[in-house]
Curated annotation (Swiss-Prot):
Lipidation (S-farnesyl cysteine): 69
Protein name as annotated: Guanine nucleotide-binding protein subunit gamma
Propeptide stretches in the record: 70-72
Organism domain of life: Eukaryota
KO phenotype (gene knockout): Leads to starvation-independent sexual development; the effect is suppressed by cAMP.
Organism encoding this protein: Schizosaccharomyces pombe (strain 972 / ATCC 24843) (Fission yeast)
Single GO BP term: G protein-coupled receptor signaling pathway
Family as reported in the entry's similarity comment: Belongs to the G protein gamma family.
Length: 72
């Protein structure tokens, strides 16, 4: 019973991916143009956020790696 449910879930995921691929391929060009600028703005802000958090991120990453090493 559980394996059948998992198979049904996998099928539904594949169907959803196919439906999304069909939808993405059928989007008209003017709609793509109108959707592109809002995507560009968050990417710019995320880049600035990454730059701001990049230097402290190195320190936290080093701490995280030392914690992982001590645990292992």
């Amino acid at each position: 019973m559980e394996t059948e449910a998992l198979l049904n879930e996998k099928i539904s995921v594949q169907q959803a991916r196919q439906e999304f691929a069909n939808y993405a391929n059928n989007i008209p060009e003017p709609m793509m143009v109108s959707v592109a600028p809002p995507k560009a703005n968050p990417s710019v802000s995320s880049k600035t956020k990454q730059q701001q958090h990049f230097k402290p991120g190195k320190a936290t990453k080093d701490k995280a790696t030392t914690k992982c090493c001590t645990i292992s």
